[in-house]
């Protein structure tokens, strides 16, 4: 949205979100930019979509807002049962402690691993993820179990 020149919550997209909700599709979004002059994919915009379409499953990339993590905590994280997160292209830009905190804050059952390839290679993203002080159970959940449950519909 930031590069394409539209806002995530623009009125023209509402019929699309409605159709996706009816079809039980997943809306996977780039979120965040931290450039106030653009702000097309802010956590606030995702929150408005989540509120307006409570049965639409949303995955908010970059922990709900690339470089807007505080804003994501204020208006998005923990507020909507239909919003999930990925950690793509974020862990390299924060301390391991902050990464662990965000995984826990978002919910260890609601975060999925992601690389944001080609921006960040999978090898770099995985190395950044593995440096976090997480239990094996949480690590496995984020690396694949959450995806299997949230996206693929597997019970585990």
PLM regions: where:
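Mid-to-C-terminal alpha-helical segments outside catalytic/metal-binding sites
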Residues: 105-112, 119-156
């Amino acid at each position: 949205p930031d590069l394409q020149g539209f806002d995530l919550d623009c009125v023209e997209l509402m019929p699309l979100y409605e159709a996706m909700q009816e079809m039980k599709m997943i809306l996977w979004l780039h979120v965040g930019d931290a450039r106030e002059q653009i702000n097309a994919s802010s956590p606030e915009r995702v929150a408005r979509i989540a509120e307006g379409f409570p049965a639409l499953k949303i995955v908010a990339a970059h922990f709900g807002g690339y470089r807007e993590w505080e804003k994501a905590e204020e208006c998005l994280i923990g507020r909507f049962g239909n919003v999930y997160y990925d950690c793509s292209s974020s862990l390299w830009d924060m301390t391991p402690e902050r990464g662990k905190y965000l995984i826990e804050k978002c919910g260890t059952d609601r975060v999925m691993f992601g690389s944001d390839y080609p921006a960040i290679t999978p090898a770099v993203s995985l190395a950044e993820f593995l440096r976090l002080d997480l239990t094996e159970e949480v690590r496995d959940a984020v690396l694949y179990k959450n995806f299997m449950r949230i996206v693929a519909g597997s019970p585990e």
